A protein has these predicted regions:
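Transmembrane beta-strand segments of Gram-negative outer membrane beta-barrel proteins
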Residues: 26-42
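Outer-membrane beta-barrel "beta-signal"
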Residues: 35, 39, 173-186
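Residue-level signature of outer-membrane beta-barrel architecture
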Residues: 69, 102-104, 140-142, 158, ...
Length: 186
């Protein structure tokens, strides 16, 4: 399967998920999230060398779009796509991920724990670096209208990169970061 065909298939699937969510908004089970995350880099590892924040001012930014469905009043599952830029050993990523939210506290119904698991696709033409993505954290959504709210997140981000550098093929790098996120929920 070619990369272009794979990208088109993913884009069509994501568009269908978003299209379905606009038809079912009256049921309030479908949600669309547009989030910005800042990645406060803690440590990075390339081969056997580990760098910390005191060695480099590691950071990153991402913009993600996810469609979620409430399978239970406390559980929401979905899929998302995003664009991310990691600084210090600069990497651009195009992650596609699955997301899960769970609301464990009955008295604070807007608070949740979340996890995202996905993979950043490879595209040398567009300068995207492939690799595994894992997020884990807590969040809070404050709805100001039936279909509009503000979302806040704090969590942990693990990103593994696979890239070529000079004469070294398939070099692997790992980045650990704290997530600070804010976004809109529709």
């Amino acid at each position: 399967m070619t990369k272009i065909f794979r990208l088109k298939s993913i884009a069509i699937l994501f568009a269908l998920i978003l299209f379905q969510s606009t038809d079912a908004k009256a049921q309030c089970k479908f949600h669309v999230d547009l989030d910005y995350h800042y990645y406060f880099g803690l440590a990075g590892k390339v081969g056997s060398k580990t760098d910390t924040r005191s060695d480099y001012n590691m950071g990153g930014n991402s913009l993600t779009l996810a469609a979620r469905y409430d399978v239970h009043p406390k559980v929401s599952v979905g899929a998302g796509v995003g664009l991310a830029r990691y600084t210090q050993r600069y990497f651009n990523t195009l992650p596609i991920y699955a997301t899960l939210r769970y609301k464990p506290i009955e008295k604070v119904k807007d608070a949740y724990v979340f996890t995202d698991l996905g993979y950043a696709i490879d595209s040398e033409k567009d300068d995207f670096t492939p690799g595994v993505l894992f997020n884990l954290g807590v969040g809070y959504t404050k709805m100001s209208a039936k279909h509009f709210g503000v979302n806040f997140q704090l969590g942990y981000n693990l990103k593994q990169f696979k890239y070529n550098h000079s004469n070294i093929p398939d070099l692997k790098s790992t980045r650990h970061s704290v997530i600070f996120g804010v976004g809109l929920t529709f």
